[in-house]
Structure formats: C-alpha cells, structure tokens
Amino acid sequence: MTTPSGSRPSIGITALGTYVPPRVVTNKDFEAHMDTSDEWIVSRTGIRERRFAAENEFTSDLGVRAVQDLLARDPDGLRDVDVVICATATPDALFPSTAALIAGQVGLSGAGAFDLSTACSGFVYALSMAQGLILGGTARRVLVVGAETLSRLVDQHDRSTAILFGDGAGAAVVGPVPQGHGFQEFVLGADSAGGPSLYARCMADRLPGGILMGERVGMNGREVFKFAVRVLGDSGQQVLDKSGLTSADVDWVIPHQANIRIIEAANERFGVPMSKTVVNIDRYGNTSSASLPLALREAVDDGRIQDGQQLLLVAFGGGLSWGACTVKWWAGAPSLTAAQQAEVTA
C-alpha cells in the first residue's frame, strides 16, 4: 500500500527525544550461561552490547523518559498534541493502552491514545498514521512513541534470539513543518504467510498477577534474513520511485537496526553506500520500534543530518511487515549538547 503526496500541507517531525536504560549488557555477559562468544555475536550480527530495563521499569516508563528528553530539548514540544500513538510489541498490558499510560504521565490526559502493533515496522506505520490524522483534521499534532522492553519477551538462554534484542524508546511529535520539508511518501505492507518465521505469542503483564505463559519470541533466522534483505531493498526502492527520487538523491538511510549483515545487503540492493547509512546496532542491538528514532536522534545530535537533507527510513518486522518513507529533514527539532544529554539521561 502506498500513500500519495500530491498537493497537501507539509507534515513532518517537529520534536524528537530518546531514552535507553542505563544497564549495559555486553556479549561477554552471555558467555556465562550459553555457548557463544563476543567474536561469534559480532561477526554474525554487528552487536557488541545492548540495554536492558530494570525489573521495575516497563515499556510506558521508557516511553515517558523519551518524551521527557523531547521536552528537555523543546519545552514547548507537546503544544497542540491531540493524539498519542505508541508503537510497541511489548505493551505494559493488553489494556489500558501503553499510549494512554504515557499520555497520562506527560500531561496529555484527555488526548486520544492508542497502541499500534507491527513489531519492528511500528515506528514507520505510526508516523504514517500520525500524518493521516493531521491531514484528515482529527489532530493538530500527534505524539508518536516507539518503546520496547524486549529483554522480557525473549528467552535469555536462547542463543538465536537473546543476543539480538535490547530495550529503549523514542518519541517524536508530528505536525506542520515549513513547505518543502517533511514526509514525502510512505510504503506500508504485510504478508502473514511469513508470520511463523518471526513471532511472539504472549508476554509479561505489569498488572497484579501478571505471568508469562507459553512460547516467547520464535524466529527462523535464515528465512527472516532472506525476507528482510528483499523487502527492505524493494520497499526502499518503491518509496524512492513514488517520491520521484533515485538512490543518488539520498543523503542518509536510517534502517531498522536488526542485523548489520541485513543492512549491508539491503543497501546494496537499492544502491546506497554504507557511508550514507546511520548504524548504531553495535551499542543497542535490535530495539524493535525504538530503533529508528534512536538512530535518527543520534545522527541529528552529532551533526550528520542537516536541515533540508533527504532521508530514507526503512524497516521490517514481525507479521511479517515492512514500512518505508522518504523525508526532507527539518532542523527545527532542537538537539542537545553532550552536557545537556548527560543531564537528561542521568
């Protein structure tokens, strides 16, 4: 499915914030309880460490911290927000929605709030939904949160999944931006035939009496790799075509941070070099719906992404699902100095 642009108001990201828990889990930490090594993990995934939430820290808590980071950068960032969307595969509970819990903690009680579940594709889906709500007149601005506590969902003794995932959150306000900036095109898709290749059946519930039952994350790594390379490359090319762009027009690719081999192979497929690709999987692992905002925020803060540059966001996830979008970046979203960032995350 594609969403056409045509002649319409410019909508984009007006504020951005992120959060990762302070607990660092290195590859060496896994060596104590499973047959693996730092060299084996790095060579196959590109991951060196990831962050795990504390026992009393839930998905909504991470999301709230990401919004607080956003507000530290832009104290007026939540002005006119009418709807909150949380993209997550690890909600605090089946209901109330994690979005509603976050809204209540950041001064947005009364705003519309709902969760969106397309696993690692969730942030792209949520950005598209946010734009639609604004263009349709339902909202003036939308707060989009991608937050995950995947460390609780995986079997920490399963080498095929435990080494891959980390916890984190990103928050973005979507709203009107200057003409010539913002979102250009979206491509969204899903194919349930591949669902058995990557799934999670149930999870811990933060409410009293919550328990973990049945299987956790299941994955056919070989099938997921083939799917991911194909769909990232194809959806990336499709959204470029819809935008009237070529790979040469792209200043930065921000891919879902799942596996460095997948990122490299997908880039080769649509012709963008790794030198134009934002990668931080080595420090955070696969944070699912949080991976895109974490990578985007980092590249804005360190000066790689500049006003007016052409961005390509691509993601895939369970479902199996995929999403891609083209964005002309607006630098009105404030960034923090290193000292300010340290104060926010302390």
From Swiss-Prot:
Pathway: Lipid metabolism; fatty acid biosynthesis. The active site is at 120, 256, 286. PANTHER family: 3-OXOACYL-[ACYL-CARRIER-PROTEIN] SYNTHASE 3, BETA-KETOACYL-[ACYL-CARRIER-PROTEIN] SYNTHASE III. Its EC number is 2.3.1.180. Catalyzes the condensation reaction of fatty acid synthesis by the addition to an acyl acceptor of two carbons from malonyl-ACP. Catalyzes the first condensation reaction which initiates fatty acid synthesis and may therefore play a role in governing the total rate of fatty acid production. Possesses both acetoacetyl-ACP synthase and acetyl transacylase activities. Its substrate specificity determines the biosynthesis of branched-chain and/or straight-chain of fatty acids. Residues 257-261 are annotated as: ACP-binding. Pfam families: ACP_syn_III, ACP_syn_III_C. Keywords: Acyltransferase, Cytoplasm, Fatty acid biosynthesis, Fatty acid metabolism, Lipid biosynthesis, Lipid metabolism, Multifunctional enzyme, Transferase. GO terms for cellular component: cytoplasm. Signal peptide: none annotated. The last Arg residue of the ACP-binding site is essential for the weak association between ACP/AcpP and FabH. GO terms for molecular function: 3-oxoacyl-[acyl-carrier-protein] synthase activity; beta-ketoacyl-acyl-carrier-protein synthase III activity. This is Beta-ketoacyl-[acyl-carrier-protein] synthase III. GO terms for biological process: fatty acid biosynthetic process; secondary metabolite biosynthetic process. It catalyses: malonyl-[ACP] + acetyl-CoA + H(+) = 3-oxobutanoyl-[ACP] + CO2 + CoA. Homodimer. It is found in: Cytoplasm. Belongs to the thiolase-like superfamily. FabH family. It is an enzyme of class 2 (transferase). It comes from the Bacteria.
